[in-house]
């Protein structure tokens, strides 16, 4: 832990693709996060998605003007938030196996995302009660807000 982290009481971490594959159940073509560049305990997380023209959704959305589907931006937010939940589960040693996306509220799409963009998903925990977690999320490209939403997730024991 860095000196700054010790002084502020925060533990910043990252997760490369291998760690994400250990944390999240998602796989190609539905893994919407390439890397976690910052995790602050159970409070917030920043994930990135590098959007490429080779992704299967661009075959139909839209062939002559490829736009990354908004619903997949929300899924990227959910997966980024899921990394927080999964780290928490792992740290607690609980028998919880899955995190399920439950609700989307206050969702707005502001600008299109196209191949070549790098999306940064900024997720902040709003609340947690037992197995329910609530998050506020923003998706940004080059610092510009492209989508935002509030989502909730439930930790489910198998």
Swiss-Prot record:
CDD domains assigned: FabZ
Keywords: Cytoplasm, Lipid A biosynthesis, Lipid biosynthesis, Lipid metabolism, Lyase
Signal peptide: none
Chief location of this protein within or outside the cell: cytoplasm
Localization annotation: Cytoplasm
EC number per UniProt: 4.2.1.59
Gene3D superfamilies in the cross-refs: Hotdog Thioesterase
GO-annotated molecular function: (3R)-hydroxyacyl-[acyl-carrier-protein] dehydratase activity
Active-site residues from the entry: 61
Catalytic activity: a (3R)-hydroxyacyl-[ACP] = a (2E)-enoyl-[ACP] + H2O
Entry superkingdom: Bacteria
Cellular component, GO, one term: cytoplasm
Pfam families: FabA
Enzyme class: lyase
GO BP: any one term: lipid A biosynthetic process
Job description of the protein: Involved in unsaturated fatty acids biosynthesis. Catalyzes the dehydration of short chain beta-hydroxyacyl-ACPs and long chain saturated and unsaturated beta-hydroxyacyl-ACPs.
Family: Belongs to the thioester dehydratase family. FabZ subfamily.
Record-given protein name: 3-hydroxyacyl-[acyl-carrier-protein] dehydratase FabZ
Native species: Methylobacterium radiotolerans (strain ATCC 27329 / DSM 1819 / JCM 2831 / NBRC 15690 / NCIMB 10815 / 0-1)
Classification lineage: Bacteria, Pseudomonadati, Pseudomonadota, Alphaproteobacteria, Hyphomicrobiales
